[in-house]
Amino acid sequence: MSKLYEWISPDSDVLEQEKTELRPPSMYKVVLNNDDYTPMEFVVEVLDKFFSMDLEKATQLMLTVHYEGKAVCGTFTAEVAETKVAQVNTYSRDNEHPLLCTMEQA
């Protein structure tokens, strides 16, 4: 009989494992902020490209950004939210638009 088998045999003493409480991850809202220079069409493009919104939903959210100053694009875990914020801000700068994307705790 192998030593490994003897070590895990039912007759051996088993240490009780400590139970850890699993909590859901903290969630963050990704927010688009209005500015006076970014074209509305570009905002719709960003919502389609980075948040997979259809034209109707992207247009509605773009109008919310325009009239209310900001709008939530989605709620994600911290890592996903950080990635989306960075992608949108980089894409906006690469296209010479001042569109600002931020995140805040949900």
UniProtKB/Swiss-Prot annotation:
Task: Identify the gene encoding this protein.
Answer: clpS
Organism's domain of life? Bacteria
The record's Gene Ontology biological-process terms are: protein catabolic process; proteolysis
Gene3D superfamilies xrefs: 3.30.1390.10
Q: Which family does it belong to?
A: Belongs to the ClpS family.
- The protein's assembly and partners: Binds to the N-terminal domain of the chaperone ClpA.
HAMAP family per the record?
ClpS (MF_00302)
As for what it does, the entry says: Involved in the modulation of the specificity of the ClpAP-mediated ATP-dependent protein degradation.
One of its Pfam families is ClpS
- The protein, known as: ATP-dependent Clp protease adapter protein ClpS
